[in-house]
């Protein structure tokens, strides 16, 4: 069970009938708890989201014996701003994100007819880029085609900056000193691993994500992650798998950073030739 404010999620991997019973019992216990404390339980807002292609999709019930109803099944659920779909490909979320960011981008361009980079780029960084990057550690396991849609919002915006219309995308980024979205995604992923490895987060909530192995400095940094084989290519794109090779290859001086800002600066310094690049082979 996970609780955030008034939002509660009960989840379980279903591999047997016993797992189904345990999940149903958890739902029943939660309902009984609300009744005991005289809390109103909104059955209409309670949904079941079945994850995975081979999910048996059992029915689950909510309520007491007198008013016990089958819980509705949803195919798309918004959780803390991220749209979750049954296949976890985040196609719907990425499309919605691109639509929202493009709308904001077009609003900026419509209201600022003088297309000076010193005006447009700060606006893009503060109003558009946060939309494109929100929750990307979660949803960046999408296909390269989907992720290109995110990059294209920045690509199209920079084409409107005065004086650099005819430059290639990467040259425009370098001229504007604006990192590619792909590069920032990679750095963002590495920053999350850094926070976990250096325990910036509560260790109890993150200790199960990675298995760090002790190594001597002659074989790279001392926070390398054990990589377990997976026979499903889809899983390799999830955060806990996709970051391993890149993280394990980081030089010791980058991983040795003591603060978040120091890590960012050292990472940028080490990869200064890639900051404005695309097609960095991270997602392949």
Please place each PLM-identified region on the residue numbering.
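Low-complexity, glycine/alanine/valine/leucine- and proline-rich hydrophobic stretches
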Residues: 212-246
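Conserved, non-catalytic sequence blocks in retroelement Pol enzymes and Pol-derived host proteins
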Residues: 15-23, 88-96, 111-122, 140-150, ...
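Catalytic palm subdomain of template-directed nucleic-acid polymerases
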Residues: 8-32
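Extended, well-ordered alpha-helical segments in internal regulatory regions
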Residues: 127-142, 191, 195-201
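Short, conserved catalytic/metal-binding micro-motifs enriched in Asp/Glu and His
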Residues: 4-6, 34, 77-87, 101, ...
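Short, conserved micro-motifs composed of acidic
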Residues: 25, 39-76
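Short, charged alpha-helical motifs in flexible N/C-terminal segments and linkers
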Residues: 31-49, 78, 146-215
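Basic, alpha-helical interaction scaffolds
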Residues: 70-137
């Amino acid at each position: 069970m996970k609780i955030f404010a008034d939002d509660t999620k009960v989840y379980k991997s279903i591999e047997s009938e016993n797992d189904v019973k345990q999940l149903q019992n958890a739902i029943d216990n939660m309902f009984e708890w609300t009744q005991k404390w005289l809390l109103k339980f909104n059955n209409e807002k309670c949904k079941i989201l079945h994850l995975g292609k081979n999910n048996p999709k059992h029915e689950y019930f909510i309520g007491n014996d007198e008013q016990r109803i089958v819980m509705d099944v949803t195919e798309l659920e918004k959780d803390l701003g991220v749209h979750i779909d049954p296949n976890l490909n985040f196609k719907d979320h990425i499309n919605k994100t691109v639509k929202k960011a493009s709308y904001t981008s077009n609003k900026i361009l419509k209201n600022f007819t003088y297309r000076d980079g010193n005006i447009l780029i700060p606006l893009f960084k503060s109003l558009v880029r946060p939309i494109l990057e929100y929750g990307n550690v979660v949803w960046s396991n999408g296909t390269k085609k989907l992720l290109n849609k995110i990059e294209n919002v920045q690509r199209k915006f920079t084409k409107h900056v005065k004086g650099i219309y005819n430059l290639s995308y990467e040259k425009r980024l370098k001229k504007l000193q604006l990192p590619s979205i792909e590069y920032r995604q990679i750095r963002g992923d590495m920053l999350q691993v850094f926070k976990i490895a250096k325990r910036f987060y509560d260790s109890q909530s993150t200790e199960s994500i990675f298995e760090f192995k002790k190594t001597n400095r002659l074989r790279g940094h001392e926070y390398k992650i054990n990589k377990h084989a997976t026979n499903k290519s889809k899983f390799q794109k999830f955060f806990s798998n996709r970051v391993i090779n890149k993280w394990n290859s980081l030089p010791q001086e980058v991983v040795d950073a003591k603060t978040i800002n120091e890590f960012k600066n050292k990472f940028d310094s080490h990869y200064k030739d890639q900051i404005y690049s695309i097609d960095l082979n991270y997602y392949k």
